[in-house]
């Protein structure tokens, strides 16, 4: 698995895929979707699909694929290599979503929460397989959120495909188990080979599991937080654990919007115009356009 594209630029997203097996262009195929790294405060989240012909599903099961969380790293690597060898009937694709992309999506002016990002990434990978002319007839997905709602959404988006969304799908359906292995192997490689663009002093590679409740992970975050610039891009700064450390260890930042909220001359809430109490008339500050240009209203010229 070549992650060189991600290593060159780990600020956005990276898509990797195998060649499409010729048989998958002709025969009806089943496709599984799963992710790795949804919960950690460190490193990317990886979504993966795996697909194969329905007629070869028994061959995939014979590899004894299982939920990646139940396998050791060596077992995952062995199964990944075996599925790569079986490239004549097994195909895969994955999206690597950087911590920076996840955090800026969640904290942007227009919020894009993790569930929506996950749903759209999964749908994008299914669409990618279809765009590659893979003859997908069945899709199995490990759920994010309510499975019924998620399934209805995917079914509406892909009306010609039989979609099944289940909790713990990675332990129920071999094709989802295979996808979970691809996702986990890719994330482990991405984390292990992460290129820090920041000039960190005494970089500690022992950060524990990467999950927010891990004491080692918390200690790593406290050690590598900059009081002005915050965390390296390896950190999902939208996670509450990271935000709490920033508030305690970093310098306070006053944003222009924050100043405006504390300005006594800012306009009142719209609901104040409909309240029954005594109305207080407050002067309104001019629009930002006029303030920046030093323009004021004039009654005479």
Swiss-Prot record:
Record field: transmembrane: none
Consequence the record notes for mutating residue 142 to N: Loss of enzyme activity
InterPro entries referenced in this protein's UniProt entry, alphabetically: RNase_H2_suA, RNase_HII/HIII, RNase_HII/HIII_dom, RNase_HII_hlx-loop-hlx_cap_dom, RNaseH-like_sf, RNaseH_sf
Composition bias, Polar residues: 272-282
Pfam families cross-referenced by the UniProt entry: RNase_HII
Catalysed transformations (reactions): Endonucleolytic cleavage to 5'-phosphomonoester
EC number: 3.1.26.4
Gene Ontology BP annotations: mismatch repair; RNA catabolic process
Modified residues (Phosphothreonine): 217
Result of changing residue 170 to N: Loss of enzyme activity
Cellular component GO terms held in the UniProt record: cytosol; nucleoplasm; ribonuclease H2 complex
UniProt-annotated location(s): Nucleus
Chief location: nucleus
Modified residues (N-acetylmethionine): 1
NCBIfam families found in the cross-reference section: ribonuclease HII
Assembly with partners or alone: The RNase H2 complex is a heterotrimer composed of the catalytic subunit RNASEH2A and the non-catalytic subunits RNASEH2B and RNASEH2C.
Protein name per Swiss-Prot or TrEMBL: Ribonuclease H2 subunit A
Originating organism: Mus musculus
Gene from which the chain derives: Rnaseh2a
């Amino acid at each position: 698995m070549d992650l060189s594209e991600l290593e060159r630029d780990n600020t956005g997203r990276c898509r990797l895929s195998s060649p499409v097996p010729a048989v998958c262009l002709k025969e009806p195929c089943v496709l599984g979707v799963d992710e790795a790294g949804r919960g950690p405060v460190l490193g990317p989240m990886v979504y993966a699909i795996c697909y194969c012909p329905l007629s070869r599903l028994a061959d995939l099961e014979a590899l004894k694929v299982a939920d990646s969380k139940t396998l050791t790293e060596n077992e995952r690597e062995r199964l990944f290599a075996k599925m790569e060898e079986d490239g004549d009937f097994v195909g895969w694709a994955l999206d690597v979503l950087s911590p920076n992309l996840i955090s800026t999506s969640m904290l942007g002016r227009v919020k894009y929460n993790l569930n929506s990002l996950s749903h759209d990434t999964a749908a994008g990978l299914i669409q990618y397989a279809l765009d590659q002319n893979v003859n997908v007839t069945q899709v199995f997905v490990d759920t994010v959120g309510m499975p019924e709602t998620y399934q209805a959404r995917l079914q509406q988006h892909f009306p010609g495909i039989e979609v099944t969304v289940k909790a713990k799908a990675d332990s129920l359906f071999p094709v989802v188990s295979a996808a979970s292995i691809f996702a986990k192997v890719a994330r482990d490689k991405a984390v292990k080979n992460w290129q820090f663009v920041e000039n960190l002093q005494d970089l500690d590679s022992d950060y524990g599991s990467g999950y927010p409740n891990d004491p080692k992970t918390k200690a790593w975050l406290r050690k590598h937080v900059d009081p002005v610039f915050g965390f390296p891009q390896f950190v999902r700064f939208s996670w509450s654990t990271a935000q709490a450390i920033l508030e305690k260890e970093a310098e306070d930042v006053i944003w222009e919007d924050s100043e405006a909220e504390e300005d006594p001359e800012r306009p009142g809430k719209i609901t104040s115009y409909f309240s029954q109490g005594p109305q207080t008339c407050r002067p309104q500050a001019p629009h930002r356009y006029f303030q920046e240009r030093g323009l004021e209203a004039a009654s005479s010229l």
